[in-house]
Curated annotation (Swiss-Prot):
Ranges for domain SAM: 595-656
Biased composition (Low complexity): 154-188, 282-297, 304-320, 691-702
Descriptive protein name: RNA-binding protein vts1
Cited function: RNA-binding protein involved in post-transcriptional regulation through transcript degradation.
Xref: Gene3D superfamilies: Transcription Factor, Ets-1
Similarity field: Belongs to the VTS1 family.
CDD domains: SAM_VTS1_fungal
GO molecular function, one term: nucleotide binding
Compositional bias ranges of the Polar residues kind: 189-208, 258-281, 321-330, 559-569, 670-681, 703-713
Cellular compartment(s): Cytoplasm, Cytosol; Cytoplasm, P-body
Biased composition (Basic residues): 570-583
Origin organism lineage: Eukaryota, Fungi, Dikarya, Ascomycota, Taphrinomycotina
Length: 713
């Protein structure tokens, strides 16, 4: 009685609240932003509704919920039948017009939505039925016909305008969708009215309050057209149901400690394969839901079975015994030799820790890694695609697998003639079989310390025999560090510029000049056992090729007559013999400057065709360049290669011959012009000769007179 009476008062107070000037009941359609024409009831209708509700409340002291809804529907039907459509639209325009110009319609819409959600269950039903009475019959039939075809579970709403009520006239779809919107209502009191009785276990129903509402939810309706506000709430309910189902499925993967300790059904048994009972309950919960949610839950349950193995079966490694673990092969770029040494390599798969007493299944006592896989065939066979190797190609393979030796470790030639182990690249001497057996037995028989595994590398390194060489800085001999990084053919050497190079100071300049290793490398022959010219860890191999980076460019000291010009060349790493052969190689496209050779015999000698000098001795450059293949055959040059080489050389020399001819023509023209100029000057001098002779005669006469006068005196 008190609950029903309190809800009626709440409904009436909220209906009074929207406007202080006029009491209005406002309704809104909340379907994805498609707002249908909203209607408002005037104050006279609301006052009549209040009076009828108060009289029905006072006359019947105790009234059930169905009877209350029935009375409300009858009162609303009577009042709305007397209303006029013009007066309602007039109040609607007045509410949206000049009354409150500063408030937008969207703000009013949000206010109405929050007001509708604050109502109780019965108040919402009453309000919605009143609004449905108020809408025109044509609009109601259009909305509800499209809605009922998409979801048959919503057939509780009648299309009749009078909406005759019955004891079973409640709308199941609306009432089942209300728990997702009702935040302040008491769910425990209304749950039996909304959904049927729960079919789940008592423990799960008490733990999860929404399980009954979720199990009877209908699928998500298909939005074929604009629908009423009832289906928006149903969509919200379905989405919240999916979210809650996923949350319950996730919670069943790792149950809390309290539920696992208190409930005896959560213990792992052979029947449930180690998973908790929540996963089974969740799968039964989502069996009535959509197919998408059930598939998601099945995937989550399968993931929980994989992520939570049974405690009774011990875990074993999946790798095979003859499969090399990745972390046991030393990375070639890892320079920390003493921090991560590799395990010794036992040929033929022999490992001393596997004796008759210990079987192969004892994975906890493994101290050594299994042997690495055999090298690829292209490393051992001299294929044209691979680089040539030395006499001992297995050294190249092991060096590629393990890495180069550090610069501070010593070398020894004891490894020749002995079985090759990986420790020969790392330690001073190769341990024999007795030493290895003693070391392994001492490690296996230890009962106090933990078994040495490949992860415990420091303990493993201290027990193996090796030489304790003090770590000192390497002495940088002239160019040794540069050549160590550049001249090796193994893949572990970097193809980059060395990090540091020695410097020297020139006399007269205070700036340090970078010194390269060309002089020391080229003047000394390659020694396969030296530290300078061989790669690190490969002192038993020969060098099939030398590597020179592109960026190393050196200056050449030119002779004194051309000291002003600075020429550059690529510094070669070969020997003097190689340089000599390069200088005398067959080079047909290099000519000194843009000038022809001195004579044809010297040019033929540079082409290695000097035996044909007699065939071409009576020919000048112009006639030589114009010779064809037939002319060369007529002159006695029958070799096809020689003819082709000569014709190609003729094409290269032809521009020089033409330029020389042009220069000669210009020079001849210049000489001719100078000769004509000198002849013209001579002709002008001969024309001026009489006046000159006359002056000479006058001067001679004057001298004669002077002489005679002097004699008379």
């Amino acid at each position: 009685m008190e609950v029903v009476e309190g809800r009626r008062k709440t409904c009436l107070d909220v209906v009074d609240s929207p406007s202080s000037r006029q009491k209005q009941t406002i309704a809104v359609s909340l379907v994805d932003g498609k707002n249908y024409p909203t209607r408002f009831l005037n104050s006279r209708t609301i006052d009549k509704l209040k009076q009828e509700l108060n009289t029905s409340n006072l006359s019947t002291g105790e009234m059930s919920t169905n009877e209350t809804l029935k009375n409300a529907q009858e009162v609303a039907g009577k009042l709305l039948s007397e209303e006029n459509e013009d007066s309602i639209s007039e109040h609607f325009d007045e509410y949206l017009g000049a009354d409150k110009p500063g408030i937008s319609f969207l703000t009013r819409l949000k206010t109405l939505e929050s007001w509708f959600q604050s109502l109780s269950l019965q108040d919402r039903l009453t309000t919605l039925r009143t609004l449905l009475h108020h809408l025109p019959s044509q609009e109601i039939s259009t909305l509800l016909s499209s809605s009922l075809t998409s979801s048959p579970s919503n057939s509780g709403l009648s299309l009749d305008k009078s909406l005759p009520s019955s004891p079973k006239g409640d709308s199941p779809s609306l009432s089942s969708s209300l728990p997702s919107l009702t935040t302040k209502s008491n769910l425990s009191g209304n749950l039996n009215m909304v959904t049927p009785a729960s079919t789940q276990g008592p423990a799960f129903s008490s733990k999860h309050g929404f399980s009954n509402a979720l199990s009877t939810a209908s699928p998500i309706p298909v939005r074929t057209s604009s629908v009423s506000s009832t289906y928006l709430t149903q969509d919200r309910e379905a989405s919240s149901k999916n979210c809650l189902s996923k949350a319950l499925a996730f919670s069943s993967i790792e149950p809390p400690a309290s539920s696992a300790s208190t409930s005896p059904r959560n213990t792992p048994t052979p029947s449930n394969n180690g998973t908790s009972i929540n996963a089974n309950v969740t799968s039964s919960l989502t069996s009535n839901s959509t197919g998408k949610t059930s598939k998601t839950t099945d995937l989550l349950i399968a993931a929980s079975k994989k992520s939570l193995p049974s405690n009774s079966t011990p875990s074993k490694p999946n790798t095979s015994f003859f499969e090399t673990p990745h972390n046991n092969i030393w990375d070639s770029r890892d320079r920390g030799a003493f921090s991560a040494p590799p395990a010794p390599f036992f040929p033929l798969g022999f490992s001393p820790h596997l004796n008759d007493e210990s079987s192969r299944s004892r994975w906890s006592n493994i101290s050594y890694s299994p042997p690495p896989p055999p090298p690829p065939p292209e490393l051992l066979n001299h294929s044209p695609k691979s680089r040539p190797l030395g006499d001992k190609p297995y050294l190249f393979y092991r060096n590629n697998q393990i890495g180069p030796r550090t610069r501070t470790e010593g070398r020894s030639s004891i490894t020749e003639g002995k079985p090759f182990l990986s420790s020969s690249l790392r330690f001073e001497h190769v341990p024999s079989a007795n030493d290895l057996n003693s070391v392994v037995n001492a490690r296996v028989e230890k009962s106090t310390g933990q078994p040495s595994t490949p992860l415990n590398r420091q303990h493993y390194f201290n027990e193996l025999p090796h030489s304790t060489t003090p770590v000192t800085l390497p002495s940088l001999i002239h160019g040794s560090e540069i050549d160590r990084r550049r001249s090796g053919f193994c893949l572990n050497n970097f193809n980059s510029t060395p990090p540091f190079q020695p410097y020297h100071y020139e006399i007269g300049s205070g700036l340090p000049q970078q010194m390269h290793a060309t002089n020391t490398i080229l003047t000394n022959p390659i020694d396969p056992n030296s530290n300078i010219s061989t790669p690190v860890g490969m002192h038993l191999c020969t060098l099939p090729y030398t590597y020179q980076p592109f960026s190393s460019v050196e200056k050449i000291e030119t002779p004194p007559n051309n000291s002003k010009n600075q020429t550059y060349r690529r510094s070669s790493r070969g020997s003097n013999k190689t340089r000599k052969s390069i200088s005398h190689s067959k080079n047909t496209d290099k000519h000194v400057g843009n000038e022809l050779p001195q004579d044809i015999p010297s040019w033929l000698r540079s082409l290695r065709l000097h035996k044909y000098t007699n065939n071409l001795k009576d020919t000048d450059w112009d006639a030589l360049v114009s010779l064809s293949d037939l002319d060369l055959q007529n002159r006695g040059i029958m070799a096809l290669g020689a003819r082709r080489k000569l014709l190609k050389s003729f094409q290269e020399v032809a521009p020089l011959v033409s330029s020389k001819k042009m220069n000669e023509n210009l020079k001849a023209a210049k000489n001719q012009s100078s000769e004509s100029l000198t002849s013209f000057k001579g002709h002008t001098d001969s024309e001026d000769l009489p006046s000159g002779s006359m002056s000479n005669e006058i001067s001679s006469n004057s001298t004669k007179q002077d002489v005679s006068s002097s004699s008379m005196d």
